[in-house]
Amino acid sequence: MAAPGPLPAAALSPGAPTPRELMHGVAGVTSRAGRDREAGSVLPAGNRGARKASRRSSSRSMSRDNKFSKKDCLSIRNVVASIQTKEGLNLKLISGDVLYIWADVIVNSVPMNLQLGGGPLSRAFLQKAGPMLQKELDDRRRETEEKVGNIFMTSGCNLDCKAVLHAVAPYWNNGAETSWQIMANIIKKCLTTVEVLSFSSITFPMIGTGSLQFPKAVFAKLILSEVFEYSSSTRPITSPLQEVHFLVYTNDDEGCQAFLDEFTNWSRINPNKARIPMAGDTQGVVGTVSKPCFTAYEMKIGAITFQVATGDIATEQVDVIVNSTARTFNRKSGVSRAILEGAGQAVESECAVLAAQPHRDFIITPGGCLKCKIIIHVPGGKDVRKTVTSVLEECEQRKYTSVSLPAIGTGNAGKNPITVADNIIDAIVDFSSQHSTPSLKTVKVVIFQPELLNIFYDSMKKRDLSASLNFQSTFSMTTCNLPEHWTDMNHQLFCMVQLEPGQSEYNTIKDKFTRTCSSYAIEKIERIQNAFLWQSYQVKKRQMDIKNDHKNNERLLFHGTDADSVPYVNQHGFNRSCAGKNAVSYGKGTYFAVDASYSAKDTYSKPDSNGRKHMYVVRVLTGVFTKGRAGLVTPPPKNPHNPTDLFDSVTNNTRSPKLFVVFFDNQAYPEYLITFTA
């Protein structure tokens, strides 16, 4: 089924090539029989016998030493939105960097000469994959002529994929019909190749939208149309291809919006298959899209896809739903109540009967009215790691492929959410170390309390090889507890609001500034409304309030900067990786001054070409502090015998502080930007 909206006739031409014809334009791909005979196939995954042997070997190896290395935990994947075709093909909009994306197949864009490194996409591929990728691509040049529209297949080398499809994409040429047709055929070839080689997932970056000038909105419309068409008319019912990913870079708002618009257009005529989370909604009801405001996270742990997202577990469509309940299996509150009420009275009655009989640490009932096959009821107060391990083993024994569970024990049982997140992921790692090719493919934690999303994300990052990657997440606006005095953001995640002179808010900030900077002239004061940064800061504040057993952890401080840094700080906050730009005397963190006069120095708030200077008024979580020293990269421990209990910040003088240094990016929120002149 094609996505709504007009497309040039060439893009959906009834005379499009057949799958067999399409395959002739792919260097490195032979027929199924040919692949089985081919001794030197570029992709072992394409040879069924080799693939089975590889699996047996992998299984023996894992069973022999029972080791599970960190490399088996792939990068966290930021899923902005997802939809499913009526034929069951899952489409996901992914935000991130191509270097840290994982899938069976990833598509790359290459020039006519097939030399990697010319554009940002192929340069990124070459950077991570290594020189062998170029060597394999050079070998493929001898098999197929180099012309626009052809694709060349290589292995993934050091990328987190089994294969790369390198496409020679067309120039936009002001929308010439041939450009549409060539790009459409490239997409068809990629989908057909994945189908023929029995891969299960493919990731499409926005190829052609850089120097080749394909408009992003046009590309989004075209590729979704082709994928829908493939799903409805070409893809077999038993197809191994289960997921198609559309990748946009983290800060590419235009590309993200283009896909969200197309997702929404399609979902309006297929509402039962849509899963496009909107502002103020965690159930996927379609509304007007402005920017993504909900996030699910995914990462690969061995053969398991681990997901975490806020939502209602009672609406999950999976094989197994886990109900975290009391030891007596009769709790009817919170998430457990939602599950039992959704399942129906018959399930509740059966649960009571089974609870009265001898049973294991959990009991199993049918799914009832829920969209699952069974419900596993577990006591939330028990050891979470052991409980989750038991659930996963039960799913595997029954050959189920998917399970959704809550953040077990974080409700009435009162367990520490950080410990729970670690325990759940540890259990999945344990399971993956024992099962190299399990039936169970997807484990999802559905979070009722949105504030737990960051906690699970932090736990995932501990196992993420690319933890240094700066993912900007998106959250439901209703979960951010935005300040009441903020201007309506119209579902946007970020905006700047200029304060009017004479307003009480303006006067408060002005007075704080002029207390030590009376000789400077204020040009304007702007309030920074950044929902994501505010959410991250508030989560950190709540953690610190609990840890220190009081709420007196916050100060309003100053930070001077240059004009070039302003856009970055407004959008992303203070990044300690920039530490050392102006000061490192008390540690390699971000520095904030008690008095505005300190930050007003030209060393810190460097004047721009027009003489304007810039200073932030910042909420900073200073908490419990101590004196800093050069070389610190984190605050020192409060007690040398307990190295994990750190001070929250450091200062120049504990009795009379003039400045504070923090070492974690979400420990400061830039609330106001003052533009001034000397």
From Swiss-Prot:
Q: Which GO terms describe its molecular function?
A: NAD+ binding; NAD+ poly-ADP-ribosyltransferase activity; NAD+-protein mono-ADP-ribosyltransferase activity; NAD+-protein-aspartate ADP-ribosyltransferase activity; NAD+-protein-glutamate ADP-ribosyltransferase activity; nucleotidyltransferase activity; transcription corepressor activity
Which InterPro entries does the entry mention? Macro_dom, Macro_dom-like, Mono-ARTD/PARP, Poly(ADP-ribose)pol_cat_dom
Domain Macro per the UniProt entry, residue ranges: 78-267, 293-464
Q: Which reaction does it catalyse?
A: L-aspartyl-[protein] + NAD(+) = 4-O-(ADP-D-ribosyl)-L-aspartyl-[protein] + nicotinamide; L-glutamyl-[protein] + NAD(+) = 5-O-(ADP-D-ribosyl)-L-glutamyl-[protein] + nicotinamide
Residue spans of biased composition, Low complexity class: 1-19
Enzyme class label: transferase
GO terms classed as biological process: negative regulation of gene expression; negative regulation of transcription by RNA polymerase II; protein poly-ADP-ribosylation
EC identifiers of the protein: 2.4.2.-
Q: Where in the cell is it found?
A: Nucleus
Task: Tell me the residue numbers annotated for binding substrate.
Answer: 312-313, 324-325, 331, 335, 409-413, 449
Q: Where is the composition biased (Basic residues)?
A: 49-58
Q: Does the keyword Lyase apply?
A: no
Please give the GO cellular component terms listed in this UniProt entry.
cytoplasm; nucleus
Q: Where is the PARP catalytic domain?
A: 482-678
The family assignment reads:
Belongs to the ARTD/PARP family.
Protein name according to UniProt:
Protein mono-ADP-ribosyltransferase PARP15
Source organism per UniProt: Homo sapiens (Human)
Q: What is the lineage of its organism?
A: Eukaryota, Metazoa, Chordata, Craniata, Vertebrata
Gene, per the UniProt record: PARP15
